[in-house]
């Protein structure tokens, strides 16, 4: 069974997934950051593939991607860094990146290398659902790689039902149509959106991302979904701690408690 499906079959609430950008703040820190996060009890990890034009990302992750590219991070290097990761790490690993670098690598080769490396799923924010259905789905399924689709408050119920029917893993609920970034709490409008999707009784579990940074936002997200994805907050802490993932993780977990 794919590790993503395994996670959601054994844990339905308070799942914590952490995002960081490969190659930031240092080129060589990717594998060690993953190992630290698993040791700290994180349930799932999203590893960002840096790209020069990350349209869905706020200033924190854009800055991380720019620096990672300057450091020399590439998709090929990332796979090289992760080639032995499954000797030590058991939790689900998801790659998050834009279509351009993935297509340059070759989608079939990309999915095959994901399987060989032990990557369980991929989030591609700029992959249209129609293209996923027509061109990409069968290739990914062949390699047991889950393609995770995003929905926003603007996504129609019809589209959400289609995504739920034709994907497997989890649905990434973007908390707002805006770019990524931390916020103190979710307003009533966003909470109504979370509840509206919860009431649809979808087949796939849901994870809420964009804007999770503290106890309040994590608890709100977890009340309406299986858990939350934290990106900008952890990337900021990683930068402040000069790549010391242990200190950054401790500070993040502290923020989620108090």
Q: Which residues does each predicted region cover?
A:
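Alpha/beta catalytic cores of nucleotide-metabolism and tRNA/nucleoside-modifying enzymes
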Residues: 78, 195-204, 213-219, 223-258
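Catalytic cores of alpha/beta
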Residues: 27-37, 155-166, 212-228
